[in-house]
């Protein structure tokens, strides 16, 4: 990748109902001024301005980075994120518009006569615009589909989503929110590349996917944070916590419009940097007592969740201890071993003082020292078995998806408002990195999740960047009441009847006290891409309640 560190690709959505508005065509809108590029303050200027507050701790850490990566400052520049060009569609083009202010104004009495809002949360600034997508127009799937935007009117943020109803039993099957990672990669990548109802071939044509996860669940694919995929804003989001408020608002307004889906079980799934997103997003939902989001579990695939436990396993995975031949020579492996103690010390400082001033140096040093040697080989960081080809994200199919999603008739059918689509926005990737989000200990939220819902961590075992060794390690190290019994639980075979009608072992699983870890054989970072049948098998089993203890 042509950035400081590897961007994690995801790697890594429904009928009429209440609060439906009768829409009238507005007068012709006035021309919108050309959006101005958004200049994000140089994070290193911010460091210098306030460094004295953390001099003893952060000063030593930063000196360490400068000693070991002396050219790092010359490679850093203030970030200028160009505002996306867009054309706002008139309200008359949308099938439904749900106003957060209408929902926030609803009060009810509880059993004791105490009045409270029907739905918790600050929703007044949000609207949800929804378009019914004609399935015959794009030929992606025959099921009912909706697309649209969540508008944060107070902050000029507009998040795009695309919903597909279940192919099986829409009013009985669960609903899943799918999130790709990056940070900065579109969830439509996961939709077309991994687990959605269709893939895009070299002729830029949609092909039916028999192993789509909407075989037995309805799915919302969400482009977040803002300025990812079809989403847009004049503002920037640079941390996971800020993004959580928007996701809660979208789900709340979506299930308000489509009550028939709100009664179903709801799950959040994602991969890669979604290992950061999902613990925060799930915690935000569970924080509210009065909600219409029936959250039942979360699924994280090949995620980055606990860097302190995961970073020690870059060297083993690259050097032949992860089940595949070594990618690096002995000198490079030794160099990674030598760098590890300093890296872990820096991550520990980030965990102790969660700030840009401690977390950013850890990201810079550790990613250069432990990911950099592998990156220089030209091997695919998402699959140790292959070389990186096609583009910076190593898969030529991603170019097909981008070309398809930039077709005017596709954008028109979906009600898209931006002028163009890109699969990953590396400015967002760097923005999250420069604000210290990368190394923060979001795994600390998982124990409180486990007290209420099951958590699945799965990992394709050929991935380097968020490898199965590190994911297994952090789940076994997690401090929660079931820690000891989970850590000592044996790995057991995962089996399925394959396409030849034979019983096949496709992975291993261990589970206790609501926490489950799966290793999926012969799959890389994007597990459903490499192992579509096995992925659908374990997803269906999980969503049906297998391994759940709450």
UniProtKB/Swiss-Prot annotation:
Q: One GO molecular function term?
A: serine-type carboxypeptidase activity
Known catalytic reactions: Release of a C-terminal amino acid with broad specificity
Q: Does the keyword Glycoprotein apply?
A: yes
Q: What is its EC number?
A: 3.4.16.5
| Positions annotated as active site in the UniProt record | 272, 463, 525
Q: Which residues are glycosylated?
A: 203, 216, 289, 387, 493, 514
Q: Which cysteines are joined by disulfide bonds?
A: 185-424, 319-333, 343-366, 350-359, 388-394
| Chain residues in the propeptide | 19-131
Q: Residues of the signal sequence?
A: 1-18
Q: Where is this region: Disordered?
A: 20-39
A matching Pfam family: Peptidase_S10
Source species, domain of life: Eukaryota
An annotated GO BP: proteolysis
Annotated localization: Vacuole
How would you classify this enzyme at the top EC level?
hydrolase
User: GO cellular component annotations, sorted alphabetically?
Assistant: fungal-type vacuole
Subcellular location, principal: other
Family according to the record: Belongs to the peptidase S10 family.
Q: What does this protein do?
A: Vacuolar carboxypeptidase involved in degradation of small peptides. Digests preferentially peptides containing an aliphatic or hydrophobic residue in P1' position, as well as methionine, leucine or phenylalanine in P1 position of ester substrate.
> Which protein are we looking at?
Carboxypeptidase Y homolog A
Its gene?
CPYA
């Amino acid at each position: 990748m042509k950035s400081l560190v590897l961007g994690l690709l995801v790697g890594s959505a429904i009928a009429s109902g209440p609060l439906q508005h009768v829409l009238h065509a507005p007068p012709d809108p006035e021309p919108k001024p050309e959006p101005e590029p958004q200049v994000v303050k140089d994070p290193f200027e911010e460091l210098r301005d306030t460094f004295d507050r953390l001099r003893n701790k952060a000063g030593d850490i930063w000196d360490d980075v400068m000693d070991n990566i002396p050219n790092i400052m010359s490679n850093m520049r203030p970030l200028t994120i160009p505002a996306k060009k867009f054309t706002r569609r008139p309200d008359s083009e949308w099938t439904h518009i749900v106003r957060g202010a209408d929902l926030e104004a609803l009060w009810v009495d509880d059993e004791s006569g105490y009045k409270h809002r029907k739905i918790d949360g600050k929703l007044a600034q949000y609207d949800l615009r929804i378009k019914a997508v004609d399935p015959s127009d794009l030929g992606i799937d025959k099921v009912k589909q909706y697309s649209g935007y969540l508008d944060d009117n107070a902050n000029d943020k507009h998040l795009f989503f695309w919903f597909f109803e279940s192919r099986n039993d829409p009013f009985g099957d669960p609903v899943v929110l799918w999130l790709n990672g990056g940070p900065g990669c579109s969830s439509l990548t996961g939709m077309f590349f991994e687990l959605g109802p269709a893939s895009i071939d070299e002729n830029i044509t949609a092909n039916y996917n028999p192993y789509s996860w909407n075989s037995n669940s309805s799915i919302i694919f969400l482009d977040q944070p803002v300025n990812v995929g079809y989403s847009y804003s004049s503002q920037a989001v640079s941390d996971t916590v800020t993004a959580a408020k928007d996701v809660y608002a979208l789900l709340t307004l979506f299930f308000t419009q489509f009550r028939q889906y709100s009664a179903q079980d709801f799950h959040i799934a994602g991969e890669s940097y979604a290992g950061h997103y999902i613990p925060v997003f799930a915690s935000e939902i569970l924080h509210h007592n009065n909600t219409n989001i029936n959250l039942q579990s979360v699924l994280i695939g090949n995620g980055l969740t606990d860097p302190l436990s995961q970073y020690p396993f870059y060297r083993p995975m690259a050097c032949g201890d992860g089940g595949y031949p070594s990618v690096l020579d002995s000198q490079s492996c030794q160099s990674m071993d030598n760098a590890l103690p300093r890296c872990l010390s820096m991550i520990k400082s980030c965990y102790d003082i969660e700030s840009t001033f401690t977390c950013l140096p850890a990201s810079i040093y550790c990613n250069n020292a432990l990911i950099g040697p592998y990156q220089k080989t030209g091997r695919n960081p998402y699959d140790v078995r292959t070389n990186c080809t096609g583009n910076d994200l190593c898969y030529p199919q991603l170019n097909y998806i981008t070309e398809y999603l930039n077709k005017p008739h596709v954008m028109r059918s979906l009600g898209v408002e931006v002028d163009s689509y890109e699969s990953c926005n590396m400015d967002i990737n760097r923005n999250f990195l420069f604000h210290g989000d990368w190394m923060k200990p979001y795994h600390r939220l998982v124990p409180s999740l486990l007290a209420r819902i099951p958590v699945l961590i799965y990992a394709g075992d050929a991935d380097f960047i968020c490898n199965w060794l590190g994911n297994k390690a952090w789940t076994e190290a997690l401090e929660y009441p079931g820690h000891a019994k989970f850590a000592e639980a044996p790995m057991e075979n995962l089996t399925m009847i394959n396409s030849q009608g034979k019983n096949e072992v496709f992975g291993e699983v261990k589970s206790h006290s609501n926490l489950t870890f799966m290793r999926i054989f012969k799959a890389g970072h994007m597990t459903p891409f490499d192992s579509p049948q096995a992925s659908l098998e374990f997803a269906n089993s999980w969503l049906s309640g297998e391994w759940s203890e709450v």
